[in-house]
UniProtKB/Swiss-Prot annotation:
Main localization category: membrane
Transmembrane portions of the chain: 34-54, 70-90, 109-130, 151-171, 197-217, 247-267, 270-290
Quaternary state and interactors: Interacts with GRP39 AND HTR1A.
Chain ranges on the Extracellular side, renumbered to this chain: 1-33, 91-108, 172-196, 268-269
Record organism: Rattus norvegicus (Rat)
Protein name: Galanin receptor type 1
Cysteine disulfide partners in this protein: C107-C185
Post-translational modification: Three cysteine residues are found in the C-terminus, at least one of which may be palmitoylated.
């Protein structure tokens, strides 16, 4: 489902021939260099940030169950980290090299996992919004519903559904060879009606409907909080509002980050996507926005969650403490016990 930066055949799938004389516009130059620098920054920030989130959430007391929200955040971070490690370095070669050199398997895998990661992210965010809805609107029943077992089952279902939905991308992604010894990795569907149907279904079920579900859940949450504001303790009110705010910001950022990607796909399938400097810039921006979504969530947690900030600091303190053989045992025990995040207590 990912549009290649050098050709549009992946976008419309109608013709495996590249645009005539694309090098003056799409050749390696200042634009591609800047894009590679942006990719490098996204990769470095995302790998560091998501690794930190995973470390924080993995450091729980033995035998203590993790909260459902934290399990979903952990799943989101794992999906983002895997995407950054497996996709961005390979996709960057498209901007750096004039031809595809990584073979058929990598051609299929990176575009397939790109779509899998996108779907896992939006489905996880939808699950988190439902989790917030149950925790706040149906708080009396939430203790029996919001358990680790149900969250893990949900995570398993999310991955299975995403893997299945993305499978056509892997099937139709293939290599095309030109007489000039150039190779391109393109998505090509023999039946264009099937391609159009798949693009629409991916947009509807992998973007639009999950966002509508998220909007519904948060509308209910905000309405409930407004009605029950007087009956809540200030501490409980602040905790629930902060958790809902954090998840909501993550959702809004996801929606903004992935909207240009879907616009380009729908435009390429049902319109005449132009090959102009402006459209090339739009495509580059869509790529960078989609990729950056995998690196911004840890920053959001740091800005909106005081407990996440404390946990981040404790990860580094723990490393310093482990390197000091004469550290105080009591202080080390305190550091080794991670604080809960705002998402833990609801």
């Amino acid at each position: 489902m990912e549009l290649a930066p050098v050709n549009l055949s992946e976008g419309n799938g109608s013709d495996p021939e590249p645009p005539a004389e694309p090098r003056p516009l799409f050749g390696i130059g200042v634009e591609n260099f800047i894009t590679l620098v942006v990719f490098g920054l996204i990769f470095a920030m995302g790998v560091l940030g998501n690794s930190l989130v995973i470390t924080v959430l993995a450091r729980s007391k033995p035998g203590k169950p993790r909260s459902t929200t934290n399990l979903f955040i952990l799943n989101l971070s794992i999906a983002d980290l895997a995407y950054l490690l497996f996709c961005i370095p390979f996709q960057a070669t498209v901007y750096a090299l004039p031809t595809w050199v990584l073979g058929a398997f990598i051609c299929k895998f990176i575009h397939y996992f790109f779509t899998v990661s996108m779907l896992v992210s939006i489905f996880t965010l939808a699950a988190m919004s439902v989790d917030r809805y149950v925790a706040i609107v149906h708080s009396r029943r939430s203790s029996s519903l919001r358990v680790s077992r149900n969250a893990l089952l949900g995570v398993g279902f999310i991955w299975a559904l995403s893997i299945a939905m993305a499978s056509p991308v892997a099937y139709y992604q293939r290599l095309f060879h030109r007489d000039s010894n150039q190779t391109f990795c393109w998505e090509h569907w023999p039946n264009q009606l099937h391609k159009k149907a798949y693009v629409v279904c991916t947009f509807v079920f992998g973007y639009l409907l999950p966002l509508l579900l998220i909007c519904f859940c948060y509308a209910k949450v905000l309405n409930h909080l407004h009605k029950k504001l007087k009956n809540m303790s200030k501490k409980s009110e602040a905790s629930k509002k902060k958790t809902a705010q954090t998840v909501l910001v993550v959702v809004v950022v996801f929606g903004i980050s992935w909207l240009p990607h879907h616009v380009i796909h729908l435009w390429a399938e049902f319109g005449a996507f132009p090959l102009t400097p402006a459209s090339f810039f739009f495509r580059i921006t869509a790529h960078c926005l989609a990729y950056s979504n995998s690196s911004v969530n840890p920053i959001i947690y740091a800005f909106l969650s005081e407990n996440f900030r404390k946990a981040y600091k404790q990860v580094f303190k723990c490393r310093v403490c482990n390197e000091s053989p004469h550290g105080d045992a009591k202080e080390k025990n305190r550091i080794d016990t991670p604080p809960s995040t705002n998402c833990t207590h609801v």
